[in-house]
């Protein structure tokens, strides 16, 4: 059988922390920031963690 390949799009969007959790960036934080208030744009630049079944799916996609 051929090797399992990791999903390259998932590898670029998600990172695995040292404790094994999946970290992601928030959406809508890259452009049109002058329309969004300062509190919202600050919050959009913070990363967050995935939870539950989505985290299991992404971890499987990253490891290949």
From Swiss-Prot:
Q: Which GO terms describe its biological process?
A: translation
Known InterPro entries for this protein?
A: Ribosomal_bL35 (IPR001706), Ribosomal_bL35-like (IPR021137), Ribosomal_bL35_CS (IPR018265), Ribosomal_bL35_sf (IPR037229)
This protein's UniProt keywords: Ribonucleoprotein, Ribosomal protein
**Can you name one GO molecular function term for this protein?**
structural constituent of ribosome
Q: What Pfam families has UniProt attached to this entry?
A: Ribosomal_L35p
**Entry GO terms, CC:** cytosolic large ribosomal subunit
For this protein, the record's PROSITE patterns field holds: RIBOSOMAL_L35 (PS00936)
Q: Which residues cross the membrane?
A: none
Database matches in NCBIfam families: rpmI_bact
Family membership, please give it.
Belongs to the bacterial ribosomal protein bL35 family.
Name-wise, this protein is Large ribosomal subunit protein bL35
Name the gene that codes for it: rpmI
